[in-house]
């Protein structure tokens, strides 16, 4: 059997070579390289792919070098259709005399369009490079009045007359300059962080397609991608692959609202036509540390926030099941009808996971709809090491899952998943005749728009689908495990240091690490209202200095009667242990004299 290792004498003799391998001489593949550049992009790429597949590793390297040299010498950014000689050549362009009206679809606007977009791409690539450069600031902070007054030619006011493309390019640069680099490895301020390059490419393509998700008619590929991805997510939860439903929504708050609407419609379908007057006095339940969107939905859907009953939590922020059952009985005694509970898998502040199994038992006992808000913690379902923290989620009637959080998908990307098929459609369908005709030439069950409370719906699926294709489930698992390891690293570094005090004892369940920084003036001081009052001011002062310096960002907040503390969250796969070390050192540097 011939060796798969390329022969060093292949250029002079083919003796002993694998008959299934074609080793082209450098002059031959260089010639074909030139042919590829003279063809249409599609055919040229096929020729290039063939040449790379059929050559040895050394010759592949030469081939790549030949392509680079050829493109560099011609200053080309891509191969295009030679029939029109439409190659993307970078040329010096005076944008000060060009306006939006000079771009496509204007007559003869193709060259100006190409040059303008190449400038925009250059701005974007420069921003991407700086985002991953740790010597670059996370933000260049300015107060609102400074930005409103104008910064070095950057004016937010709108004018009646068009401005030149040169000014538009300046505006593009400055918009990024004065924003926050949420993809920076040292940005820890929110649950949604990172800048995934595959996701970025997907978002660019999504904007270029500029379509709507309401019908298969105008978004055939995207609609199918959404259905396939939602099905996969339901399977990961543990539901049957044959049943179930779901839709992507503008965010976790809207996904949670969908769950309440679906539950209400399931138990009281007449509410759709007759309103709240046709149903009994309904109450719903959620933990006192759940996301505020549950109360907001209660207000928006006509229940009233007083009828969103808060369940007590233990010191780690988890629902106390006994209190949940007691509040159900109390509500029933008062003449209310309990119908829904929200359990949280990964609370916003503590990162706590409610005991879903015990809550599900109570829901079955009293016939309540169980929703799991896994907006923050849903990503852990991708991890074989950590998915046990969501045990029982397969018993839920609905689940919120935000890939734009722990999975690093670019904003926005949130899914509401329903165990029973047909409820979303029945709850929200209005049969708008101009969109949802039943006599179309294709299977209209793929027209998903009537399941949504929106009409127009942004394409959120493509970047997520593309990332999943690029990473695989194991890729998501790896980056999620890494983020949780970094949280464990931070906890281990600060738990026994006198400069820091943990908000609660024990290792974090999620990547949330909650702690106080204790300045020198408060170390060793016994707990008292005066000490808590002083401690309450520490985190805001450090955060203000942090933003002024622009070196890093981390959030803070109070919780119950606790003084302001830092809430560290990690969801950016670009972060490393050195970034955690930097954060600790920066907090100490900024807070040492407080």
UniProtKB/Swiss-Prot annotation:
Modified residues (N6-(pyridoxal phosphate)lysine): 405
GO molecular function, one term: identical protein binding
GO biological process per UniProt: gamma-aminobutyric acid biosynthetic process; glutamate catabolic process; locomotory exploration behavior; social behavior
Phosphoserine carried by residues: 78
Catalytic activity field: L-glutamate + H(+) = 4-aminobutanoate + CO2
Classification via Pfam families: Pyridoxal_deC (PF00282)
Region of interest: Disordered: 1-23
Similarity-based family: Belongs to the group II decarboxylase family.
Biased composition annotated in UniProt, kind: Low complexity: 1-13
Coiled coil: none
Organism of origin: Pan troglodytes (Chimpanzee)
Binding site for 4-aminobutanoate: 190-192, 567
Listed EC numbers: 4.1.1.15
Gene: GAD1
Self-association and partners: Homodimer.
Annotated protein name in UniProt: Glutamate decarboxylase 1
Keywords in alphabetical order: Decarboxylase, Lyase, Neurotransmitter biosynthesis, Phosphoprotein, Pyridoxal phosphate
Role: Catalyzes the synthesis of the inhibitory neurotransmitter gamma-aminobutyric acid (GABA) with pyridoxal 5'-phosphate as cofactor.
Required co-factors: pyridoxal 5'-phosphate
GO cellular component, one term: perinuclear region of cytoplasm
Leading EC class: lyase
